């Protein structure tokens, strides 16, 4: 997921996306532990997407404080 796509979403949409990404990460980790053949980088990419979403949400929160 691109940062441009993330920045174009509203804060509510980002919170929903964050929740779904966290669920997806849990599922991916569990599947990886069960199968032992899962792709490690898939989990890494989900974690990076979560970090991007959290970064944008925190930036918006800081902007609200300063306005």
Swiss-Prot record:
Show the stretches that span the lipid bilayer.
none
For biological process, the GO terms are: translation
Q: Which UniProt keywords apply?
A: Ribonucleoprotein, Ribosomal protein
Keyword hit for Transport? no
Signal peptide segment:
none
Keyword Ribonucleoprotein among UniProt keywords: yes
For this protein, the record's InterPro entries field holds: Ribosomal_uL29, Ribosomal_uL29_sf
> Gene3D superfamilies annotated for this entry?
1.10.287.310
A GO term, aspect molecular function: structural constituent of ribosome
Pfam family for this entry, one: Ribosomal_L29
Q: Which GO terms describe its cellular component?
A: ribonucleoprotein complex; ribosome
* UniProt family annotation: Belongs to the universal ribosomal protein uL29 family.
Q: What is this protein called?
A: Large ribosomal subunit protein uL29
Give the organism the record lists. Answer: Ehrlichia canis (strain Jake)
Q: Which gene encodes it?
A: rpmC
């Amino acid at each position: 997921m691109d940062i441009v796509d993330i920045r174009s979403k509203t804060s509510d949409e980002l919170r929903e996306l964050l929740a779904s990404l966290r669920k997806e990460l849990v599922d991916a980790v569990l599947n990886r532990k069960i199968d032992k053949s899962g792709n490690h980088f898939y989990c890494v990419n989900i974690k990076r997407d979560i970090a991007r979403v959290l970064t944008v949400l925190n930036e918006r929160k800081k902007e609200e404080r300063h306005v």
